């Protein structure tokens, strides 16, 4: 019993002294679960987007709602370098290597989220609509493994470039 108490004290002591993982903040571009309105221009994830991308996403969101009643949400937009690095570090921990993690999360130096040139759209029906109809607004799905990742990659009404297999391929 005494040794069990010692172990319990050690475990509780370690738990209390462990530092919590840093959390992202809205000023870093963190977006609440479920996403935010693409019209929330006061949120850094929207405000810091490239203006042409922001306008195209807002126009597409209006059309998706009018045509199909789809409520498009931005689940990720602009991100600070710090937040992007945190996401990459978490992905490395989850997937075991930088090479595997980069298939889903790019480095801050290469991320189009950091440069304000990409948004992730949700929920699934909205991501699907943007993937199929977004080119009307110049918006394109970029990665085959991320239907939600959208960039301004053509002229309105133009043809989207071929999909890249994943973020590491670009």
Predicted regions, residues:
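Secretory targeting and sorting signals
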Residues: 1-21
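Cell-envelope/glycan interface and biosynthesis
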Residues: 21-170
């Amino acid at each position: 019993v005494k040794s069990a108490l010692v172990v319990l004290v050690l475990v509780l002591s370690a738990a209390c002294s462990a530092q919590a993982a840093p959390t992202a903040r809205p000023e870093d571009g963190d977006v609440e679960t479920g996403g935010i309105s693409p019209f929330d221009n006061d949120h850094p994830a929207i405000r810091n987007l490239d203006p042409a991308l922001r306008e195209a996403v807002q126009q597409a969101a209006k059309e998706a709602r009018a045509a199909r009643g789809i409520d498009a949400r931005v689940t990720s937009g602009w991100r600070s370098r710090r937040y992007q690095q945190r996401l990459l570090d978490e992905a490395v921990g989850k997937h075991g290597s930088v090479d595997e993690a980069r298939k889903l999360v790019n480095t801050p130096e290469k991320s189009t989220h950091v440069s304000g040139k990409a948004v992730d759209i949700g929920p699934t029906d909205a991501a699907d609509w943007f993937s199929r109809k977004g080119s009307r607004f110049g918006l394109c799905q970029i990665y085959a493994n991320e239907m939600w990742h959208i960039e301004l990659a053509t002229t309105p009404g133009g043809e989207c470039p071929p999909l890249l297999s994943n973020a590491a391929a670009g």
